[in-house]
Amino acid sequence: MSSKQEPVVLGKIGSSHGIKGWLKITTYTESVEGIFDYSPWLIKEQGEWREVKVTQWRFQGKAVVASLEGVETRDQAQMLTNCEIAVSAEQMQELPEDEFYWRDLIGCEVTNTKGYNMGKVQEIVETGSNDVLLVKANAKDGFGKAERMIPFVTEQFVLEVNLTEKQILVDWDPDF
């Protein structure tokens, strides 16, 4: 790959399906079929990314299965089990203002309106009602917290996101 940006992982290859090289696909996209909006895929084998093309895909019961170019036997398919599926960062859609890819929020410093550094975003948790920032507190947190869970509700709790500076401003009590 010529891009210096890391590929964006959108899913993972599961077990083989049938004898003609089809594979079960686990997708991390919002909709199950969303992963098929991207082409080509990048598959990580033995630490290296390589490009592959999806030739067909379909729902198989509750699962999604796909056929990849050059994978025509069960043995070839089994060699890809548990490989990550990614796309180049350039393929990601431009988002409207005030919408963010989770991957871009990871590692951002979180500060509240009183200037208290709450820590860094470690991950984002989907709760059903709204997403939640899991913020790993600083080692010497003045409130004795190891982590904080801050609802990602813009204008109410999350006041500003500056991806260039990797900063998030929140209206959140550090003792909560």
Swiss-Prot record:
Predominant cellular place of this UniProt entry's protein: cytoplasm
An MF annotation (GO) of this entry: ribosome binding
Record's subcellular location: Cytoplasm
Superkingdom in the source lineage: Bacteria
Notes concerning its domains: The PRC barrel domain binds ribosomal protein uS19.
PANTHER family according to UniProt: RIBOSOME MATURATION FACTOR RIMM
Protein name: Ribosome maturation factor RimM
Species per Swiss-Prot/TrEMBL record: Shewanella woodyi (strain ATCC 51908 / MS32)
Gene name of this polypeptide: rimM
